[in-house]
């Protein structure tokens, strides 16, 4: 054995290794990565970024997700505890804990599905993206077929799956994230050409939109359209072209609203929910949501103390869960929920930027697409509950009652965690 090596102490070896590691890291960090997509600045081409520090498992993202799921579970029980007294549910034999049990089972099933989704490499997701998109289209067609799709309150949105009702439009959100990201990767060289790159994606969105609007579910279509547009923009589509498309989409949605009498009525009710004409009609949910939030004041009336959930506020355990949170936890609780979702969205977007910095464009766009989805849907749901936006049937991600939504939210976040995991493997010098 070499005498110098034999005489080296453990501290000496550690310091040598530490010095070597620091030099290697500084060499890696000094290498710019040229990115073909937007990272938040004005430029697109030749954007430079470096991977962030190497850490272990992203525990913060997991714990924030767990916190939202747990709080949602508690609030679904609180908001639904009086529903079995409703004759509609009483005839079906629903007990006081029916919705809690169903929601807990949905969360457990979603957790198992998320664990399985996490095991799938991003290369596999990229290859499967077009096929998953086709499957989502077929399910959207199937739900419209009589005696196959389940109709509730005039909307045909669910497929019977035995232990749960599955909503294909939720799968379409995940499918659109993956498909749009893989599409942009394939079209990266011609992304500036409208007819070869942008138009085919627009046609795909229109096809999905026609199927979703036939249910009808305008809220889901809005989310899917924003996901596609967000990924196109983040993928580096010409800004001028993007804003022209955005303007056309806004005009299209405006035309849909203007041509539908009951949608126009919703807009009028949103503008004046307290009027005698709307207070007991289209403005009923909004007015009682505002009453609930107003009753909560700063610190709320306490967990379980909500009055509006006692058959006054419709859909208190789904679309208007935030109103019950505002009543029971007050402004403090609402601000905490907003803060958690802001952090979650920012972290997911950051993981996407980190993947792009490692030249993993598909993974980066998928993560950012999930961030756009969760951030936009949360914004719409909160805006509706607070009276800032017209009433729209969108749930609060990770919290509201709804098995399909919870399942797809968890799978989407599992994919993001997979992206983060692969980022860390690459930064350690491994392969994925």
Swiss-Prot record:
A single cellular component GO annotation: cell division site
Main localization, broad class: membrane
Catalytic activity: [GlcNAc-(1->4)-Mur2Ac(oyl-L-Ala-gamma-D-Glu-L-Lys-D-Ala-D-Ala)](n)-di-trans,octa-cis-undecaprenyl diphosphate + beta-D-GlcNAc-(1->4)-Mur2Ac(oyl-L-Ala-gamma-D-Glu-L-Lys-D-Ala-D-Ala)-di-trans,octa-cis-undecaprenyl diphosphate = [GlcNAc-(1->4)-Mur2Ac(oyl-L-Ala-gamma-D-Glu-L-Lys-D-Ala-D-Ala)](n+1)-di-trans,octa-cis-undecaprenyl diphosphate + di-trans,octa-cis-undecaprenyl diphosphate + H(+)
Keyword vocabulary terms for this entry: Cell cycle, Cell division, Cell inner membrane, Cell membrane, Cell shape, Cell wall biogenesis/degradation, Glycosyltransferase, Membrane, Peptidoglycan synthesis, Transferase, Transmembrane, Transmembrane helix
Annotated EC: 2.4.99.28
Membership in a protein family: Belongs to the SEDS family. FtsW subfamily.
Protein name: Probable peptidoglycan glycosyltransferase FtsW
Organism, as annotated: Variovorax paradoxus (strain EPS)
